[in-house]
Amino acid sequence: MALAPSKVSTFSGFSPKPSVGGAQKNPTCSVSLSFLNEKLGSRNLRVCASTVPLTGVIFEPFEEVKKSELAVPTAPQVSLARQNYADECESAINEQINVEYNASYVYHSLFAYFDRDNVALKGFAKFFKESSEEEREHAEKLMKYQNTRGGRVVLHPIKNAPSEFEHVEKGDALYAMELALSLEKLVNEKLLNVHSVADRNNDPQMADFIESEFLSEQVESIKKISEYVAQLRRVGKGHGVWHFDQRLLD
C-alpha cells in the first residue's frame, strides 16, 4: 500500500474514546497515525504500547539493593560471592570431594597392581589409571564449584587403599573390575545424596550442577563397567583375560 507523502499526517497524541459506561477501552495506547490512500480512502492506524508491567511490579534496582540480604560483606574472611548457599550444601560438596578423591586413590592402587612386572596387564593398568585421573578431575571440579558459590573447601582424610587384588576363584582381573563396578555405584549413591541435599535446601543451581556435570556420566560409567564384568565372566581366568587386556590397551 503506497502512501502519498504530502498527505500523510503527523503523529498526534492519543485521546481514548470512552466505551459503554464511560470506561476507556485501552488506557495504555499512546499514539495514533492517520494516512490517506488515493484508492482506499482515509485509514487510521493506532499504535499501542503498554505502560503497565504485566506482573504489576516495576523493577526498582536502587531501592531493592538496599535489602539486608544483598548487602556486600565488609568483614574479613567472608565470601563476597556467597548467596543462598546453605551450610548443609557446603558440607555436602566437601564430603563429595572426599568421595571422589578416595575413589581416585583406589583406582590408582589398581593401576599400580596391574602395572607390576609379574602381573603385566597393561590394558587394565591403563584403564584404572585413566579412571583415577577422572575421579581426581571430578574432585577438582567440585572444589572449583565450592569456591564459585562462596564456600570453603575442607579436605578430609583419605583411607588407605589395598595393594593386593588377587582372588583365587575369580582371578585378579574379574575381581578388580567387580570392585570398580561396586565403587562406581557407591559414588553414584553419594552423588544422589548431594542432589537431595540441594533439593532439601531449595538450591536449584547446585542441583543443576550435579545433574549436568556428574549424574549422566556416572550411569554411563556403570553401564560400561557392567559390560566389562559380564565379558570377563565369560572368558574366565585363562587366555581370554590377555585378549581382553589387549582390547583395553587399544
Swiss-Prot record:
Domain of life: Eukaryota
A Gene Ontology BP annotation from the UniProt entry: intracellular iron ion homeostasis
Binding site for Fe cation 2: 135, 184, 218
Enzyme Commission number(s): 1.16.3.1
Protein name: Ferritin-1, chloroplastic
Family affiliation: Belongs to the ferritin family.
Keyword terms: Chloroplast, Iron, Iron storage, Metal-binding, Oxidoreductase, Plastid, Transit peptide
Function: Stores iron in a soluble, non-toxic, readily available form. Important for iron homeostasis. Has ferroxidase activity. Iron is taken up in the ferrous form and deposited as ferric hydroxides after oxidation.
Note: Multiple cleavage sites may occur in the extension peptide yielding several smaller (26.5 kDa) ferritins subunits.
GO molecular function: ferric iron binding; ferrous iron binding; ferroxidase activity
Binding locations of Fe cation 1: 100, 135, 138
Catalytic activity: 4 Fe(2+) + O2 + 4 H(+) = 4 Fe(3+) + 2 H2O
Reported tissue expression: Leaf > hypocotyl.
InterPro entries associated with the record: Ferritin (IPR001519), Ferritin-like (IPR012347), Ferritin-like_diiron (IPR009040), Ferritin-like_SF (IPR009078), Ferritin_CS (IPR014034), Ferritin_DPS_dom (IPR008331)
